[in-house]
Amino acid sequence: MVKEFFLNILSLIKNALVKFMKFFNTHFNRTTLKTKSILKKIEKNKENINVAMSNLSGSASIFYIWKAKDLKKYEDVLKHAGKSSFDLKYKEFEMDLNENNHYLEIPLTMSLDLKYVVEKSFEQFNASKNFAKSFKISSDTMKGASETSIKFATKEIEAEKIKENQRLVNDLNKLNILYRKVINNSLKSHNELLSKVEEYIK
């Protein structure tokens, strides 16, 4: 019984990580390769870019960079999952994510270094990736253990303990929605910036 219990936990964690790494390989690695390609193009076409930038006129375009590092203060929300303090911590995280402006605005001027803009955005992109990876692994481990505890519940396990595990699973599912929002905002912001930069290095 105990052996089967732990094998179930390991199986759930393994399956979750396989899916997560597939997501990473598909989206993050593709964006990373595109970033490196654009940085090479900037270096290769430096003179042409400088000429194009010096001829800029009219109102300046704005580059928007998603500031993932703003959210590092919420990394400990995971510790509150399943506890009475979770609702307040979750609400703070959700409100900050929805209501606050997490974008760094950089106007495009003739003195602007495109390489700096791409690297600055890539830095935030990687911060988001690390935040998500750490969160996802911890979350899936906790969730796998709780779901298995519920599945293997017997009369020896108190009903209150089952309820606690179910609450933890529910809290982690709610957090998963916010985690995905952080990821999607980061991917969208960085890819849009790369597309915008590409217009100046053709």
Task: List PLM regions with ranges.
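Low-complexity, intrinsically disordered, cysteine-poor segments enriched in small/polar
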Residues: E4-K19, F23-R30, K34
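Long, low-complexity or tandemly repetitive, helically biased scaffold regions used
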Residues: K36-K202
